[in-house]
Amino acid sequence: SGGFTLAQRAELSAEAFSHTATYDIAVATWMAAEVVGEDPDFPRWRGASWTRRDVLRYGENPHQGAAVYETNPPQAGVATAIQVHGKQMSYNNYVDADAALRAAFDFSEPAVAIIKHTNPCGIAVAESEEQAYRKAFATDPVSAFGGVVAVNRTVSRALAEAMAEVFIEVIIAPDFERPALDVLQQKKNLRILRMPGPGSGEGTEGRIVTGGMLVQSIDEVSAEGDDPSSWSLVAGNAVDADTGRDLHFAWRACRSVKSNAILLAHDGAAVGIGMGQVNRVDSARLAVERAAGRAKGAVAASDAFFPFADGLGVLIDAGVRAVVQPGGSVRDDEAFAAAQEAGITMYTTGTRH
């Protein structure tokens, strides 16, 4: 007679408890930081709640179920980006879009990152977003096919027309000009995401492991050693301004590459990327192979030190003229001596990514 059914009352009760639980978590978190004085990033007790945003077709593989959740309260990020066109996002689309967004927003100038399986297969900066895209695509055109593209500027019609020339899974950017959407929306399956900025800016990130969770501060290119003015010249002569800009670009771009990572760059663009190898020699070889003739005269960044001089030797033999790396190996002197003997410049940052 106009009342609620038992099932409806149960559903409303569950919803009410989810709201009160979220509120209790917020209160407990605030009290730990503000009243008890615990470190807000790594408190003794940690709680959070999420609301399901969508059920996905499947997870990383077709036999895995999956869903995407947003934080309570919602925060800026890939999970809350506005999809303005295209097929439903997949689990892998979300993972790659997150990596692409972080890579593109590592730069203040117009930048484009093209991601496949969480690794950049193209990344570049330029005076315009269209130029940055064309340079990023030229890094590895074969691998860029079917990639996820992030732009840290509004997408113009010119950029949209360039991207429409090839198959792309996802494009994520702060905004899109109306004429750009008119071009891109002709591709009915292309997923277009509007994401106003680089993300929520939270200081930590977590990773679920069996029996618990690891939490760490987010790896951003903002440490003292990320400033080129703090780098130490350990071999060769100081570089000119153009080479210095390329070294700085290579160092920032290398952060988004899975270790062991070697990135070769020229004119504000990656020309060869070696990623995810279990030793630095193979990463150097892969970067040189991908760069082909473009390795000669390029600069290189390594995400960690050279444990031996052999990986550096691969770069020297390919014609790389300057290298930036963290340093810190017990055999640093061997790498420094090899660079000096080859007549190339080497800087150390004292920071690892």
Regions found by a protein language model. Give the residues of each.
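ATP-dependent carboxylate/acyl-activation modules
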Residues: H19, Y23-H353
